[in-house]
């Protein structure tokens, strides 16, 4: 909800409608947007999914309801080590729970809701999570993996979710996911951009990284560090040479 200070006009924003509006009002304005959750853990040839949440008339189809209905289903099978806060209250939340929620939040805030067609799709498998949203990446993959920069397509949605306790600060969400997965020794989460379908999928596999891949990753990291160090040395050498040239010109009285 917002008021234009110049015109005095006030009303519900599109972000507010998508987040908290009624399903009917949302479909009247965004008849191209769909939400779909499927649990595909231990499926067989005859069973395509074990659980599903989509438009079925039993719930108000806005983004916040979708998020709050699906999130517990995503995390219910994750391990919860016994830990007490202040020696009294049990803590059921873990970094893995937080990373999964962050993947969900990223899908919502980076989706393009103005496309002709698009599905916010969440798939849970026994060893992975997949979050797919319509729209292409707004930053190069390298910048996203590095973190620190943020170009949320829907900053107002991001603010709404953060105010109710979901989502990290701008630019830190995806690195949080990477750090948690790395600490578990799992395969690095992968962002897949499909420019033909105009969609992005985040794949978070709970699968141990092989020793070979781990060594390769460490080698690449070392190479990048070495390249960065070499670059800095070259910059200093270049500055030193220019400084010597300037001194020579000054001494010559030019």
What name fits each language-model region?
Residues 1-254:
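C-terminal regulatory or interaction extensions
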